[in-house]
Amino acid sequence: MYKKILLPTDGSSYADQEVERVKNILAEDGEVIVLSVAGLLTSSAFQSRKKVKKVNDKLKKDAQRYVDNMAAKFDDDVKVTKMVVRGFPSDAINEVANNEGVDLIVISSTGKSGLHRFVLGSVTEKVLKNSEVDVLLVHNE
């Protein structure tokens, strides 16, 4: 049984599978950290700062919604910490895992469909390669 589990989410439809896995392996007095990494768009010569801020605000709002939706799938007696951070997903996931002292990262084998599926699959691969803690890979059905 694991006492502190990091559960990253990208808002994909596989959350139920991941949550069920966590429920089965979380210690009775354990904690789950539900994390979403909001991308960060930087301004360029082609985009106004106002537009960039608007996009970044939407990315953060979406990430918060993903975290809230996944956290709501746990029973009230489970300690759930919700986090939204900015950065590159694989780096941010491993950084949070190290900083928060988690025992396990539970992550989906793929994320959203289309191009996102390819990109998030590579995020999973980088987390697996660079993690300093155990990683449970949930194959999507």
Question: What are these model-predicted stretches?
Answer:
Residues N98-E141:
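Gly/Ser-rich helix-loop-strand patches that form or flank binding pockets
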Residues E20, D68, A72, E125:
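Active-site phosphate/pyrophosphate- and oxyanion-stabilizing loops and adjacent acidic/basic residues
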Residues I33-L35, T81-V85, L136:
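General small-molecule cofactor/ligand-binding pocket signal
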